[in-house]
UniProtKB/Swiss-Prot annotation:
This is Succinate dehydrogenase assembly factor 2, mitochondrial. The lineage of its organism: Eukaryota, Fungi, Dikarya, Ascomycota, Saccharomycotina. It holds the Pfam family Sdh5. HAMAP family: SDHAF2 (MF_03057). It comes from Kluyveromyces lactis (strain ATCC 8585 / CBS 2359 / DSM 70799 / NBRC 1267 / NRRL Y-1140 / WM37) (Yeast). It is found in: Mitochondrion matrix. Belongs to the SDHAF2 family. Keywords: Chaperone, Mitochondrion. Interacts with the flavoprotein subunit within the SDH catalytic dimer. Its main location: mitochondrion.
Amino acid sequence: MLRTVFNKPSVLKSGVNSITKQCRSLHANAYLLNKGNSNGAEGQDDDVTVRIRIPPIKRTGESLDKKRARLIYQSRKRGILETDLLLSRFAAKYLKEMTPEQLEEYDQLLNELDWDIYYWATENYSITPLPDRWKNSNILKQLQEFSKNKDREILSMPDLSKY
């Protein structure tokens, strides 16, 4: 069956044409998104051209136990190893003791981009500047202190029993 499809030049040609059209369309859309995003220097574009912000899900009536369980999961499953290790260890140490207000603040922090959280926690503001909304955050200050790893512990994902 496959042999007959690929032996017909018209079928193969139409498939290639379809892929070519899709690639051109994607390239055109990328050009339109990037257009006008220069950083002030003529002919130079930002390294990050588009940031799409997806609003977080509004959770109403969530119990504290459910919120803690969700925050544990979100701290452990970020997608970037560095942030996973940092946030999962932080959650294992502090999440049980957090007040409802602190849990809400931590929840809002987890809605930020992974690399932003990592650079803010490690106080590397030259790469990702700290927004005003986080400058007075007690949770972020606690995370920054925690990220210094003053005890020089070997970082590994904490066991779920630690939460």
